[in-house]
């Protein structure tokens, strides 16, 4: 699996911004079949940083209803990546 197939997108919320500033942790949506080692190698290769730890979790899709039609959002996987002290990823700076 290629690095750009593993890392889908960064997750940018108030909570993840606080984690980024205080704990040097970045949150990503990743491929569901990727493991921690794959995610670590992909982050290190794409962003040229060193990773200290990776936490992953499966997020269940919510059931949504629009009128009488009931559907479900897809399940996805989230990874919280802790960078080594002194390392940074600057893709949201200046926004």
From Swiss-Prot:
Keywords from the named record: Ribonucleoprotein, Ribosomal protein, RNA-binding, rRNA-binding
InterPro entries (UniProt xref): Nucleotide-bd_a/b_plait_sf (IPR012677), Ribosomal_uL23-like (IPR013025), Ribosomal_uL23/eL15/eS24_sf (IPR012678)
One GO biological process term: translation
Keyword Cell membrane: no
UniProt keyword Ribonucleoprotein present: yes
Any one annotated GO CC term: ribosome
Gene Ontology molecular function terms on file: rRNA binding; structural constituent of ribosome
General function of this protein: One of the early assembly proteins it binds 23S rRNA. One of the proteins that surrounds the polypeptide exit tunnel on the outside of the ribosome. Forms the main docking site for trigger factor binding to the ribosome.
Family from the record: Belongs to the universal ribosomal protein uL23 family.
Subunit structure: Part of the 50S ribosomal subunit. Contacts protein L29, and trigger factor when it is bound to the ribosome.
Record-linked PANTHER family: 60S RIBOSOMAL PROTEIN L23A (PTHR11620)
Entry-linked HAMAP family: Ribosomal_uL23_B
Name of the protein in question: Large ribosomal subunit protein uL23
Species of the source: Desulforapulum autotrophicum (strain ATCC 43914 / DSM 3382 / VKM B-1955 / HRM2)
Phylogenetic lineage: Bacteria, Pseudomonadati, Thermodesulfobacteriota, Desulfobacteria, Desulfobacterales
Gene that this sequence comes from: rplW
């Amino acid at each position: 699996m290629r690095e750009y197939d593993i890392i889908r997108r960064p997750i940018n919320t108030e909570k993840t911004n606080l984690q980024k500033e205080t704990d040097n942790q970045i949150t990503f949506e990743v491929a569901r079949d990727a493991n921690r080692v794959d995610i670590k190698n992909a982050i290190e290769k794409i962003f040229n940083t060193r990773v200290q730890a990776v936490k992953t979790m499966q997020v269940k899709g919510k059931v949504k209803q629009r009128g009488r039609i009931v559907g479900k959002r897809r399940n996805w996987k989230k990874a919280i990546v802790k960078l080594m002290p002194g390392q940074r990823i600057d893709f949201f700076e200046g926004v």
